[in-house]
Amino acid sequence: MALPVYYDKDIDLGVIQSLQVGIIGYGVQGEAQALNLRDSKVKVRIGLYQGSLSVSKAKKEGFEVLGVKELVQQSDVIMALLPDELHKEVLEKEVIPFLKEGQIIGFAHGFSVHFNQVVLPKGVGAILVAPKGPGSALREEYLKNRGLYHLIAIEQESSIHNAKAVALSYAKAMGGGRMGVLETSFKEECESDLFGEQAVLCGGLEAIVRMGFETLIKAGYPEELAYFECVHEVKLVADLLHYKGVEGLRKHISNTAEFGAIKAREPMGNLLEKRMQKILKKIQNGAFAKDFLLEKSLNYPRLNTERKALKETKIEQIGEILRAPFNHKK
């Protein structure tokens, strides 16, 4: 089913320009959104905790910085641009008790709302405005008079403002209307985003890359060649996929590579499909969210162990050497 798509010509920028926006958090995404909004003539303030390392940076870039509670009390639209696992703790203590009927709270990812980490008062709007890319790309594309695709969704209507109109206007102010703003739901955005991260973009890709590298190493091939063939050249293929699609990728590789891809897909396809279905099921039934929130409550033991172990792997050690010339050029 095709999603509704909105462009600049369909959206009233004046809606968000007439409101006071408060952004909680000033990481890469928070900074990019704040800068884009300000350049689109939107009134923006930043909410941070006393002692936050981001306070000086936000002030240096010309933003008024308030405490989170104060920001909530002085804003029409509050964007919670914090890590997913912090939403419950921060919003329950510093945001929800001070919300007034008619205000709108926004999210860049549906995790905390969809998995019931956050329950909002009646009359308070809940919107999703999700740029499809990192904060660095969001800012870079805006400055080039381009934009990223954006997703919007409405979970709860505001008693004063039209939540959809606000979400669309916010997305336009960030440059989303230049590319396209697609309307979905918190559920669909959250589950598809988690699945993409786990099965393909982060988990799946990393697993294939590392297994490919280890397979060649165990078979006696030099680490440098294994790295080039299984890691380094991923960017070339990813760029072709991004700009040309699957068919375009096929047209830009050799017959040998294309035929080899088809032959390799046959034994891998069924196994991958079954594994991916299991991953999706655990996302849909809340098992992944439960595991992740438990990990957070224990202070991330598995993440910390994995991060430490990764530094000692051959793929990282040879990779650091081979990436050095690229990093030096920067």
Swiss-Prot record:
Annotated Gene3D superfamilies: 6.10.240.10, NAD(P)-binding Rossmann-like Domain (3.40.50.720)
Protein name, as recorded: Ketol-acid reductoisomerase (NADP(+))
Keywords carried by this UniProt record: Amino-acid biosynthesis, Branched-chain amino acid biosynthesis, Magnesium, Metal-binding, NADP, Oxidoreductase
GO biological process per UniProt: isoleucine biosynthetic process; L-valine biosynthetic process
Active-site feature positions: 109
Organism: Helicobacter pylori (strain J99 / ATCC 700824) (Campylobacter pylori J99)
Tagged with keyword Metal-binding: yes
Residues that coordinate or bind substrate: 254
InterPro entries per the UniProt record, alphabetical: 6-PGluconate_DH-like_C_sf, KARI, KARI_C, KARI_N, KARI_prok, NAD(P)-bd_dom_sf
Keyword Oxidoreductase: yes
Family as reported in the entry's similarity comment: Belongs to the ketol-acid reductoisomerase family.
GO molecular function: ketol-acid reductoisomerase activity; magnesium ion binding; NADP binding
